[in-house]
């Protein structure tokens, strides 16, 4: 963003040097990449008057001129210009002047035997124009208002500096001269002098505009105004040309220049369409109702102002008139409807588009313009109609136009947005400022204090905020052109620190410094990962972006590749691929887990963190070459491994068989519950999913909701240490084997055994599962090991015989089974 200091001075009082201001802007967040002294090329150039001209005796093309530059003695200058004559006012380069435009340093010299003490210059030689015919002759009315010897910089209005600012994405207000002026006012604590609106015009809220909802979304707006009796031949006044030129924009004509001027001054892009050309395009008289904003069609094209003919597609948003493309929205206008010398009436467009669609259109066609760069950073729609009004005000100064009607798509929401700002929060975040007493050497006397309410309010008022006093501090109202970056309390605190000066705050950290610590969730998650790793699992990390395969995936608005265009809704598919790749590489087993996020589109967009994993093969031993021994794990072995890994969380996780998970084997899968809440699933992968991956038979998948299991495991009573006396007597074990109906859960059976035993029954474990067709399809054999122990004596068979028999009897009755021999 380039802006001249003279333009800034018309808007804000500047009471410091250009270099000092440049430094303050950079420290304040508006980095000045370069500072150009406009007078650099005309240093040593002064106003002179040609007193006499005589022909050079030794040359037909040279003249000897006596030129008065306000000194006691006039200069003798040999000049070769055809248009030099007596009594004209000229630009004189004195001895020692360097003309950078032609890389020439003026020296006192002798030309064809005649001494020459300077040079009479053309505008080309001064670097003002690209080409010139003869020397520059200064208008007598201008010259008579200045003394001879006046600097050329003053005559050419070049006593100015141009700041080239690097505006960051979080400060879109810096893309306007008024925004930069407000920043300078805040940094220097000086007064603003913004131009007011001379006339306001009637607005018509037309809600029947055909507007693409993606382009004109919330806090967006489209307006179009018909302005008659203008003249495309009229050129811009000098002040307007000068401001555009120093901002790097070429002057075209007054109509185009005013739209560019508002772009620079207010940061609001405008576009002018030639009304007659629009009418010719659609074959009838055009109306504001004909304008629309829509997605382009794949078979359309548009010849634009830069002379390029762009092929359009559905990723480009266009402005249409009677459905015919006339501009690429927010990027560049069409050449066919552009303003030229024959223009007598225009439609003036002012809009705010969704930054995302502007960025997408700009990227697709491969150009970035002054307009698109501002839309991409963000513009407040609350300033748009005022910017349009400001443009029409300037048009009224130069054309005899009738007051137009501004047709707009929506009414402005004048509801104030207030940000609560707490006094105590400011103190906590910023700490005290340090006052250095200049009466003491080496700043040995330092005073520390917190910011006063007056200091806080004054700084926020400097950036246009309005403050309402509250008990806790203030409710702060933000001006529209800062509404893109001042969104939260912390943003306001940052502004206060920036304007006070970061170097003013105490550098010492709070004392004492409390060491950071992990939350209970973080500790539990680390325990969980440790438990899995210790039990042979490897942690993996898969990509959360996947290709589009079904409609229920959440699409990314600006994907880099089609393969990464959507957010994943599961992790298990990637884990199947990881296991398959490992097995193909020669690995005998693959036990993996991952903690990651999945994303759901329905019913509402949601994000869920889960623990997902896969178990394939047995990692306990290697097989002999040529061995036919099966290396696959059974369902219960795999489930036991997961149980062992999760035991570190001290959770009781129950299994309930299910056949409703479509990617799991209907007879070998279960849903997992803890404290009555479903927390995940475990099961063998469905054979249909691995028909082309035969190696992955007997592969098991599991998933757990991280938030649910960590909440259950971190309850306070979970981690209360319970001390037990170390057993001093041996335990006695008995095995029992029954054939059960498969409808009974192992957890139910174990629970019943524990209830049936007395305090001597210490533990119950499932040690064997046997499934055979001879039992019938609905039956299965389970073997349990019961452990008995008395804390005071060694048990005998007679001590537990009756108890063990009682347990067997209860199990037989409860589950309609018989003890196997």
From Swiss-Prot:
Its main location: cytoplasm. Residues 727-820 form the FDX-ACB domain. Keywords: Aminoacyl-tRNA synthetase, ATP-binding, Cytoplasm, Ligase, Magnesium, Metal-binding, Nucleotide-binding, Protein biosynthesis, RNA-binding, tRNA-binding. GO terms for biological process: phenylalanyl-tRNA aminoacylation. One of its GO terms (molecular function) is phenylalanine-tRNA ligase activity. Mg(2+) binds at residues 485, 491, 494-495. Its cofactor is Mg(2+). HAMAP family: Phe_tRNA_synth_beta1 (MF_00283). This is Phenylalanine--tRNA ligase beta subunit. The gene is pheT.
């Amino acid at each position: 963003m380039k802006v001249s200091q003279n333009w800034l001075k018309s808007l804000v009082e500047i009471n410091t040097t250009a270099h000092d201001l440049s430094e303050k802007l950079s420290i304040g967040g508006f980095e000045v990449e370069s500072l150009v002294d406009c007078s650099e090329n005309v240093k040593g150039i002064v106003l002179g008057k040609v007193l006499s001209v005589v022909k050079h005796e030794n040359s037909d093309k040279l003249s000897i001129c006596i030129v008065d530059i306000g000194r006691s003695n006039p200069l003798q200058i040999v000049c070769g210009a055809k248009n030099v004559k007596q009594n004209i006012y000229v630009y004189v380069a004195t001895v020692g002047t360097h003309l950078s435009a032609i890389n020439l340093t003026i020296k006192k010299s002798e030309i064809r035997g005649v001494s020459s003490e300077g040079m009479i210059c053309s505008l080309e030689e001064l670097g003002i124009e690209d080409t010139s015919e003869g020397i520059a002759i200064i208008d007598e009315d201008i010259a008579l208002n200045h003394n001879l010897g006046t600097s050329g910089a003053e005559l050419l209005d070049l006593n100015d500096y141009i700041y080239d600012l690097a505006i960051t994405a979080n400060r879109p207000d810096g893309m306007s001269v008024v925004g930069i002026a407000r920043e300078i006012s805040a940094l220097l604590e000086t007064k603003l002098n913004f131009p007011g609106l001379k006339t306001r015009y009637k607005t018509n809220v037309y809600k029947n505009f055909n507007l693409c909802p993606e382009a004109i979304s919330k806090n967006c707006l489209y307006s179009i105004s018909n302005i008659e009796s203008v003249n495309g031949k009229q050129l811009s006044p000098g002040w307007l040309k000068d401001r555009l030129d120093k901002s790097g924009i070429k002057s075209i004509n007054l109509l185009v220049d005013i739209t560019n001027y508002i772009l620079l001054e207010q940061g609001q892009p405008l576009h002018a369409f030639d009304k007659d050309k629009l009418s010719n395009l659609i074959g009838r008289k055009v109306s504001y109702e004909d304008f629309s904003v829509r997605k382009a069609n794949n078979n359309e094209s548009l010849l634009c102002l830069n002379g390029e003919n762009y092929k359009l597609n559905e990723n480009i948003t266009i402005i249409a008139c009677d459905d015919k493309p006339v501009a690429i929205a927010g990027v560049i206008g069409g050449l066919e409807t552009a303003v030229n010398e024959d223009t007598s009436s225009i439609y003036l467009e002012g809009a705010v588009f969704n930054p995302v669609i502007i960025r997408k259109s700009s990227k697709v066609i491969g150009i970035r313009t002054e307009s698109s760069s501002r839309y991409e950073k963000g513009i407040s729609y609350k300033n748009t109609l005022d910017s349009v009004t400001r443009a029409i005000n300037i048009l009224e100064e130069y054309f005899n136009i009738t007051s137009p009607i501004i047709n707009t798509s929506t009414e402005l929401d004048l509801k104030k947005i207030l940000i609560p700002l707490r006094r105590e929060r400011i103190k906590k975040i910023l700490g005290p400022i340090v006052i250095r007493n200049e009466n003491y050497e080496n700043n040995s006397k330092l005073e520390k204090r917190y910011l006063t309410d007056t200091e806080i309010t004054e700084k926020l008022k400097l950036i246009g905020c309005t403050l309402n006093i509250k008990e806790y501090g203030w409710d702060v109202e933000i001006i529209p052109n800062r509404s893109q970056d001042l969104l939260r309390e912390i943003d306001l605190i940052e502004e206060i620190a920036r304007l006070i000066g970061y170097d003013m705050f105490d550098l010492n950290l709070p004392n004492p410094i409390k060491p950071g610590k992990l939350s209970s969730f973080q500790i539990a998650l680390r325990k969980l990962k440790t438990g899995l790793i210790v039990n042979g699992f490897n942690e993996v990390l898969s990509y959360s972006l996947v290709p589009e395969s079904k409609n229920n995936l959440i699409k990314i608005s600006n994907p880099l590749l089609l393969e990464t265009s959507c957010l994943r809704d599961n992790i298990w598919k990637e884990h199947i691929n990881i296991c398959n790749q490992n097995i193909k590489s020669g690995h005998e087993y693959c036990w993996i887990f991952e903690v990651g996020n999945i994303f759901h589109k329905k019913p509402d967009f949601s994000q869920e963190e889960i623990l997902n994993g896969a178990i394939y093969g047995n990692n306990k031993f290697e097989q002999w070459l040529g061995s036919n021994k099966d290396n696959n794990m059974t369902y219960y072995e795999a489930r036991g491994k997961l149980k062992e890994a999760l035991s570190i969380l001290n959770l009781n996780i129950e299994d309930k068989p299910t056949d409703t998970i479509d990617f799991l084997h209907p007879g070998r899968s279960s849903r997992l519950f803890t404290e009555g809440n479903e927390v995940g699933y475990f099961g063998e992968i469905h054979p249909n999913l691995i028909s082309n991956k035969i190696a992955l038979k007997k592969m098991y998948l599991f998933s757990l909701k991280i938030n649910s299991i960590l909440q259950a495991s971190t309850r306070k009573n979970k981690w209360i240490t319970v001390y037990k006396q170390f057993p001093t007597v041996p335990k006695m074990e008995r095995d029992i084997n029954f054939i059960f109906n498969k409808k009974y859960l192992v957890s139910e059976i174990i629970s019943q055994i524990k209830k049936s035993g007395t305090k001597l029954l210490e533990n119950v474990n499932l040690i064997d599962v046997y499934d055979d067709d001879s039992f019938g399809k609905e039956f299965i054999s389970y073997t349990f090991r019961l452990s008995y122990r008395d804390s005071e004596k060694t048990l005998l068979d007679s001590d537990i015989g009756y108890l063990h028999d009682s347990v067997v009897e209860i199990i037989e009755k409860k589950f309609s089974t018989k003890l196997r021999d």
